[in-house]
Amino acid sequence: MSSPEKFSPAPESNSNPSLPDALIISCIARVSRLYYPILSFVSKSFRSLLASPELYKERSLLNRTEGCLYVCLYLNPFESPSWFTLCLKPDQALSSETSNKKKSSGYVLATVSIPHPRLVQRSSLVAVGSNIYNIGRSISPYSSVSIFDCRSHTWREAPSLPVELVEVSAGVLDGKIYVAGSCKDGDSLNLKNTFEVFDTKTQVWDHVPIPYNETKHNIYSKSLCIDEKWYVGAKRKVVSYNPKKGIWDLVESEMCSYKSSYDYCEIENVLYSVEKTWRGTVFRWYDTELGRWRKLEGLNMPYSGTGDRGGKKMIWCAVITLERRKNSGIWGNVEWFAHVLTVPKTFVFQKFLAATV
């Protein structure tokens, strides 16, 4: 079985491109980000241009920004995490626009080369624009915050949390990162809840007051943002916070039914969840108006599980388009479904995120 997908770089060219950098940037800015990992092997000068701020300014001016998938894995539990990004295979890049072949064979997770990798944990990784924020590190307690720039693939430091947290979970709403966590309660061995908010524009932390006694007796370690509210959960209880009104509310317990794991995400202000059953993989979405989970119609996904492939595991990826229909909920359609990466069987999945670049 093959090892994680890697592309072999082409021999370096001895001559520099005769075209000026500004013209090359203007051309590359019009190309989908799916091609960038392949273009990076053209030459060192190309690699430099692909990470330049000028390129992404041009992409923004041309309205060519797009969502890019990033995946974080621990291939070895004793090593730093590895990052991957979804791209086109080299043998598909030039022909994908005109070929009649199915798209399912044209995508792969390519390794992202990072000079100084950081320790991460899934609940504390969030994407805001072209940046991925790592709230704290894997060593507890922690308060450090770092930013992964998805344009240059480099880390930089951000202002630390005002308190040291033992547990942490983060969500994004209107460009602000809302963090739920627990910290030591004075000199006692008990833990107390603390909620903080980080403005990514001003790079300033602020405290979110906790008015309910309910939140003072439960350690809230999972959070997300939908419907212009920040939802924070612990076990079978969920509270929501409306930042514009400064109001906390208790939420129906139904929301916790299929959100007990990390197999959930928010897409265009709707919460989706995935559950593995003996009948197959079931997708659901949460109807905030009715206060209950509803099945995502139109999908017939096979049961997903794990199996030994010569000491390796295969990671598969699916792209599902979503359509909201009148009086019939939300429907899904599988665009493509394919094997995108082979990893050691000891790997540990952390998180996948979509950054806008």
Swiss-Prot record:
InterPro entries found in the cross-reference section: F-box/kelch-repeat_ARATH, F-box_dom, Kelch-typ_b-propeller
Species in which this protein is naturally found: Arabidopsis thaliana (Mouse-ear cress)
What Pfam families does this protein's entry cite? Answer: F-box, Kelch_FKB95
Cross-referenced CDD domains? F-box_AtAFR-like
Record protein name field: Putative F-box/kelch-repeat protein At5g38680
The protein's UniProt keywords, in alphabetical order, are:
Kelch repeat, Repeat
SMART domains xref list:
FBOX
The chain positions of domain F-box read: 14-61
- Higher taxonomy: Eukaryota, Viridiplantae, Streptophyta, Embryophyta, Tracheophyta
Return the Kelch repeat spans. 131-175, 177-224, 226-267, 268-313
